[in-house]
Structure formats: C-alpha cells, structure tokens
Amino acid sequence: MKNDISELENRKLYILISKTHTVPARIIKFWTKEPYAHASIALDLELREMYSFARKGIYNPFNCGFIIEDIDTGIFGRDVETSCVVLELTVTDKQYRHVLQELAAFKANADLYRYNFWGLYGVIRNKAIERKYNYFCSQFVASVLERSGIHILDKQPGLVRPDDFRKSSNVKVIYKGLLRRYREYLWTHDLVQAFGGHVTKQAM
C-alpha cells in the first residue's frame, strides 16, 4: 500500500527492526520463521528518541510495556551482537505532527499499557487479538503510523510482524548490520561523503 504524501515531503521517521539473543527473541523468531523479532519507531536518524513495547528491565521478560529505548543501554546495551535494519520513511509535516501527538499520549499514560502477549499468539494463528492498552512491538509501531494517517502496510496492526516494515515499498533501508556499529556508520558515512567517497551499508 502506498503512503499518501501529496503534501511537502519534509519529514523523516525511522523504524528499527532488530534481533537480540534473548530467549523471548529466539522464541518469536522460531514461531514466525523470520529474521527479526523486534520493532521500534524513532524520530531521528541517530535513534536517540525511540519508542517501543518491550521489557522494562533487563532481567524480567514478563515486566513489559511502553518504553523509551536506548541503543546503548538495556537489552541493546547488554547484547552487543544485536543485528538490525534501520528503515527511513518519508512523511508529511502533518503526519509527523500526528505521530508526535500519538507518542505524547503513550508517554502521558505509560502506566496503563501492557504487553500484548496474547497478540503474539494471534499473529501465529493469523487472527488479530487486539485489546485496549495492550500492544506488542510491531503492533505498536503499526498503530502509531496508521492513526497518524501513514498507511504503508496492507495488514491490520494486530497482525503486523517486524519484518513487514522492511518489505514495505514505502521505506528505504539505510543500514543493515550490528546495532552497536550504527552510529559509527553514520559518522563514517558523513565523513566519507564529505570527500566524495562511498561507504558500504553492510557492517557485519
């Protein structure tokens, strides 16, 4: 499905899909038979303002909900072998502002939200299980986009898997490799481009 960006295209959003080596990630990967098990939405290229639904601490996989993510701390910081794909999505200024409003609502009511464990089972059965205040990671990202008028998938949010974002014709892959090397890649890419060179996007 094509995203309607008939207005001035002057905003970017970023979707991070990733695979850690935690037990839940391995289970999800086994169930879905897909390479990535987690999705997050970011407002900036460096992924410094990024949101998702996941565990709130490192050690308890069942204490999950809406979180502000940091690629240098938490599970990402602990698992230095986390692999990822960073996707860039062009949106209108109006759509971008709607995303900000959606995220502000999540932040203001963070204590109400829970992880949609049953929803993961629904994805496997191809039957969406959507409950108020309950989301899994890719359902959350898809819901924020859809409610902001950004239609890039042909699935309802409760059936969206992390890898569905990568398969969308509306996104641009800007990085694939180890998450811990992502910001280094950005710096190197900018430095090399300043001298008219080229740097690979694969940092394995």
Regions found by a protein language model. Name each.
Residues 1-204:
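Cysteine-nucleophile amide-bond enzymes
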